[in-house]
A protein has these predicted regions:
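A hydrophobic membrane-anchoring alpha-helix module
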Residues: 126-144
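Short, well-ordered alpha-helical segments
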Residues: 99-108
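N-terminal amphipathic alpha-helical segments
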Residues: 1-73, 88-95, 106, 113, ...
């Protein structure tokens, strides 16, 4: 069985970007966690997605080696996740200061009001939940592929040792 040298660099980049984005969203929304059960659940989902991305990052980071089929499947699923990560990045951009900081009480108040009201828009919470769910489904499949690969490798190594 031919072995590939891990997964493509763009896959590692997608995973790293996903970690940064989920951590940014999580940091912002955790401050609102006690305000509403929906936000608390969303924080738990973001945290879970972030942890899944971290585990995947450790698993696929070089010098990890996989056969071509495993490598292709993992790359395909992580690339599908890129769309959801991009959408989450858009949501993160909405809560970060997007306009140049201007001096003055009025500008400061407008920025604070915008940031304070944003998490409570129900549609926004639903969108983020959908994006997180989409990303988790693809990542879960990628992790399952890696688990099957590891199990097969362990089984073949164990069988060779018995003979």
């Amino acid at each position: 069985m031919a072995e590939a040298f891990g997964v493509a660099g763009n896959v590692i980049g997608i995973v790293s970007l996903g970690i940064q984005i989920t951590q940014g969203l999580l940091k912002y929304y955790e401050s609102w966690k006690d305000q509403d059960n929906d936000i608390s659940n969303m924080c738990a989902s973001l945290d879970s997605l972030s942890e899944t991305l971290k585990i995947l990052s450790k698993t696929i980071h070089p010098p990890a080696r996989f056969d071509d089929t495993t490598k292709d499947s993992v790359e395909k699923n992580v690339n599908r996740t890129d769309g959801a990560v991009g959408k989450l990045k858009g949501e993160l951009g909405k809560i970060q200061d997007t306009e140049p900081i201007q001096s003055g009480v009025r500008s400061t108040m407008r920025r604070h009001v915008r940031r304070a009201l944003y998490p409570f828009i129900e549609e926004t919470l639903s969108k983020i939940k959908r994006f997180v769910s989409e990303a988790r489904q693809n990542l879960d499949f990628a992790l399952q592929v890696l688990q099957v690969f590891a199990s097969q490798r362990f089984a073949s190594t164990g069988t060779q040792g018995l003979g």
